[in-house]
Amino acid sequence: MKKIVVVHTSLVSHEELTRLFSEIIPEAEIRNIIDDSLLAEVSANGHITPGIVSRMCKYFENAQAIGADLIFNQCSSVGEAAAIAARTVSVPVLRIDEAMAEEAVSLGQRIGVVATVGSTVEPSCNLVRSKALSAGRNVEVIPYLVDGALDVLMREGRERH
């Protein structure tokens, strides 16, 4: 049985991701590491901090220690920390927005990045640029923040968000 360890920065998507993994890979064992201080810290600072990187490295090392076959990083805001942490383990790491960035780069040169969390804008734009560079493509990345959407998500839930 394959084991997937999901590293979360909030409880918001925990149930939905667990359900999706169970539907897509029913034979997989899903384990979760949840640290809601990560999103709060990156939001307060506007970028990842050395403390975030340190904790992400420890979480990835813990995931590897419990036998993960895949580590899934649930949050775009800490995606750059996940990329650093991925270099500390031998387990494959998948970022939640990685496939989206690759697909966007394959589809066009002007790419809009719509984010509902302010701390996600820069890392998501950087990921798209990185994927474009790897693919040998020139792209223009246009960021857009839906201001207040995170507050709606936390107060009113996913449907309203």
What is each model feature region?
Residues 1-161:
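Non-catalytic structural scaffold of enzyme domains
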